[in-house]
Design a protein with these regions (language model features):
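Outer-membrane beta-barrel pore domains
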Residues: 40-43, 84-88, 109, 118, ...
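Outer membrane beta-barrel
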Residues: 15-34, 45-176, 200-205, 209-216, ...
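Cleavable N-terminal export/targeting peptides
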Residues: 1-13, 127-128
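Charged, glycine/proline-rich intrinsically disordered loops and linkers
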Residues: 120-126, 130-137, 184-189, 274-282
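Juxtamembrane/transmembrane-helix boundary motifs at the membrane-water interface
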Residues: 36-38
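Short, P/G- and charge-enriched loop/turn segments at secondary-structure junctions
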Residues: 13-14, 137-140, 192-195, 285
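Loop-centered beta-sheet repeat module
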Residues: 176-233
Length: 376
């Protein structure tokens, strides 16, 4: 975590007020998405056209053991508070975070800011409204950044040639309706429903990671993450998310791999035959469990001011679906991405990418992104 934080901090170029121990930083990305093969239906399949992502962050140092961070984000969902928390640090091995933050889960959320990753959109397991057909799929496995209220205890231990990180946390967790079939992400950012836990029961999670120094400019990192809880108001519908990630830095070449899986319990209701597309199995049992998993494989290679990126990612959903859903009992989408990021002035980058979506339930789609992103 600290290795990543140092890289991000160096790339973000914050404005620092040494006298007051304050840091101010931010980033902006303007991206244009088009679906050239089906331009007439693009608005119904995703957020085609221009979208902007803005983040503004203020960090305040109150001394050796206490800091505060506040971050405001603006994107397609409007203005949101991306973080507002205190860090109470005893030493490297023990830090307590309280407030509103992104809990430690997976690798990509550490670099979710558009200024810190080279593609215009996020990997499919972490999608937050940018993938084609995101409404039909109801996003990925866990949208990033996942922002929530709660408490986290984390720390880092340094040993010869290695760095060990851990985190455990309790947060409000994802939300859904009574009798729901999946998470309803609008409930987590709707002022009408309040920014509070919907069932009074915390969601808990943990992460453990290791980074190994393999020599000059060579680092191997790996991590495991988990999160579990209930998402309905009655706290009867449970979920479990597990993830594994690995990355390898070889001089200036970066290779990343990540896998996420979520098991979600859903309500079958009083009349499942009318509600769901598929009936009971041959044994007469109607399953109330769905599986949603996804993967992401990436390689980045810079050549001076130009960085080439190749990405292969995908999603799968298995389990019953609503009778009105266009998905099947097992639905899959694979995406192939070729991207170029060009440093045009300072840390400002021009991002371009071509993505091929291979759907099991819809026509395949070609998506083209062109955008500009940078920190300040």
């Amino acid at each position: 975590m600290l290795l990543v934080a140092r890289v991000v901090a160096a790339d973000s170029a914050p404005i620092q007020d040494r006298a007051a121990n304050r840091n101010f930083a931010g980033s902006i990305q303007l991206d244009y998405l088009t679906l050239p093969e089906h331009p007439s239906v693009a608005p119904t399949e995703g957020f085609a056209g221009a979208t902007v992502e803005l983040s503004l962050k203020l960090a305040m140092d109150f001394g050796e053991h206490t800091t505060a961070n506040v971050k405001v984000c603006y994107a397609c969902h409007g203005f949101e508070v991306g973080m507002a928390y205190f860090d109470l640090r005893y030493n490297d091995e023990l830090n307590v975070r309280v407030g509103r933050f992104t809990p430690s889960f997976g690798s990509f959320p550490l670099r979710h800011d558009p200024a810190n990753h080279m593609t215009s959109d996020k990997p499919l397991p972490y999608d937050m409204g940018r993938m084609v057909r995101f409404r039909e799929w109801n996003e990925g496995v866990l949208p990033a950044p996942w922002v929530d209220n709660g408490i986290e205890v984390n720390g880092t231990h340094f040993v010869s040639g290695a760095q060990l990180d851990y985190a455990v946390y309790a947060i409000g967790g994802p939300k859904g309706n009574a009798g729901g079939i999946d998470f309803d992400y609008t409930l987590s950012r709707s002022g009408e429903r309040y920014y509070v836990d919907n069932n009074g029961e915390p969601t808990v999670g943990a992460r453990a990671a290791i980074a190994l120094d393999l020599g000059p400019r060579r680092v191997l990192s790996a991590g495991l993450s988990t999160m579990a809880g209930h998402y309905d108001p009655a706290a009867k519908l449970g979920f479990l998310i597990a993830g594994a990630d690995a990355s390898l830095q070889l001089d200036r070449t970066s290779l990343r791999a990540e896998y996420l899986a979520r098991w979600t319990r859903f309500a079958t209701g009083d009349d499942p035959a009318a509600t769901f597309k598929y009936g009971p199995t041959a044994s007469g049992r109607l399953s109330s469990l769905s599986l949603r998993d996804g993967f992401d494989l990436e390689i980045e290679q810079p050549f001076g001011p130009v960085t080439l990126i190749a990405r292969w990612d995908g999603l799968r959903r298995a389990g019953n679906v609503l009778a009105t859903s266009p998905l099947r009992s097992t639905s899959i989408v694979l995406r192939y991405t070729a991207a170029v990021a060009i440093r045009i002035a300072g840390a400002l980058r021009l991002k371009t990418s071509v993505e091929r979506y291979d759907f099991s339930d819809f026509e395949d789609e070609l998506a083209v992104h062109v955008g500009i992103a940078g920190p300040f």
